[in-house]
Amino acid sequence: PGFQRLSRALQYLPRETQVVGLAKAPAFMKPLELAARTHIRRQIADPELRRKVTPDFQIGCKRMLISNNYYPALARPNVDLVTDGIAEVTADGIVTRDGTTRQVDAIVVATGFHVTDSPTFAGIFGKDGRSLADVFDATGMQGYKGAAVAGFPNMFFLVGPNTGLGHTSMVYMIESQLNYVVDAIETIDRHRIGTVEVRAEVQDDYNRNLQDALKRSVWNNGGCASWYLDKHGNNTTLWPSFTFEFRRITRHFDLDAYRSVAAADLPPVPAQTPAAVRDTDETDARKVAAQ
């Protein structure tokens, strides 16, 4: 067990210290960027190919990938790296924007993934009837400790706004959030609470501090266009500090940051017949389908 902890620490600490350069003092990333550019020069002999694969932005602005065989694969004689955009897909190939037609047997589409506009958000509705998708679209993806959102009582989720990482493992963050949510459930049960909802002013203050911390980060100022930034220009995906700092603030559920109503004070829910429940479910299903 002791050796396992040492092995974990030797992997964790070097990655964790990168956040100093990524989020707090970007100048500290210069040696790493120099090493990366030197690596490209050593791996890629062809000047034109080297030009294509050399980023024109600061290291860390986009997610850093570690690979021993990526550049050698691109340098193989049977590989062409085409950076022109695709203008058209034909029956047996693709046409790039420079007018060149290339026949292909298969097209692998690697267009990324939904982060700030996940399809699941459209099916979650708050106390005012607005969906989570509508709220995030209007204001940007904001939450409290990545687990709760103002206007959505009794809703907790994992890997929410500003819990992503650009330097180390997400597992540590997920474990931290699990501790927070489990403690929330136990607190609600222990105090016989009917509903909890994070206070809007608490959420606003939390996000204001996050955005202030992110203003000087490589992710915001590194000169690239990435999925880290939303259409409002805010970085609503990444945590701008050490992961152990996030674990500290999620160690216990902070009930005072929430509005709570005792279960005994909630109005009774009218009894529904099986037919009424079925009609409600069908209506909700039609709403989701229509969206």
Predicted stretch roles:
Residues 1-291:
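N-terminal FAD-binding dinucleotide-binding subdomain shared by FAD-dependent oxidases/monooxygenases
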